[in-house]
Amino acid sequence: MPLKGEKNRQKSTKQRSKSLQTKKQDRENCPHCATGAETYGYLKRAYVYDVDLARKIVSDGREPVELERDDVAYCVDNSRIHQQHIDHVNPKYPGILGHLWGPGEDGTWEHGHVLIDGNHRAARCLRDGLPFQAYLLSEDESEQILKRGAGRNGQVYDRMSKDD
C-alpha cells in the first residue's frame, strides 16, 4: 500500500513524463523548429544574419541582459511568430541581439538593435509573464555575422551562398 501522498506523487510524475513526451513530439513535428544552418532575415531579408555563428560567438561566457517588457513586445510585434511553435520553445535560453544600421525616413544613417534569435521564446515570455534575456553582440560581431545588409559605415554586405 502506498504511503500517504505517494499515489499523488506517482501520478504527478506520470503526468510530467507524458507532458514532456507531448512537447518532444510537438518539437519533432513542428515545421518551424530549426534544422540545419539557421539564419534570421529582417525587413523581407534585406538583412540576413548568421544565427549559428552568433550562437558560437555568445558562447564565450558573457552574461545576458534582461530586456524591458516594451522592448520584448516590440521585437515580437515586428517578427513573424508561429503560435504552434511557442508552447514547446524553452524560455530559459536567452536570445541574441545584433546591431542594425540603415537609412532612416529622413535619409540619415540610423543605428538600432534587432533580435536575431529568440523571437518565439520572447513571445512565450510575454505570454507567460516571464522575464526575457538576450546576449548582446558588439558592433564588430554584428558585422561579422551579417550575411546581407548594410554595416555601420554604410558598407553593403552580400555574403549569401546558394544554400542560404
Over which residues does each language-model region extend?
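Residues immediately within or flanking Cys/His clusters that coordinate Zn2+
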Residues: 27
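Basic- and aromatic-enriched surface patches that contact anionic nucleotides/nucleic acids
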Residues: 109-164
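Short Lys/Arg-rich cationic patches that frequently serve as NLS/NoLS or arginine-rich RNA/DNA-binding motifs
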Residues: 2-23
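Conserved catalytic or regulatory cores that recognize and/or transform ribose-phosphate-containing ligands
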Residues: 23, 40-46, 57, 62, ...
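General secretory precursor processing signal
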Residues: 20, 33-36, 78
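Cysteine-cluster motifs in flexible loop/terminal segments that predominantly coordinate metals
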Residues: 30
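Short alpha-helix boundary/capping and kink motifs at helix termini
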Residues: 55-116, 126-127, 133
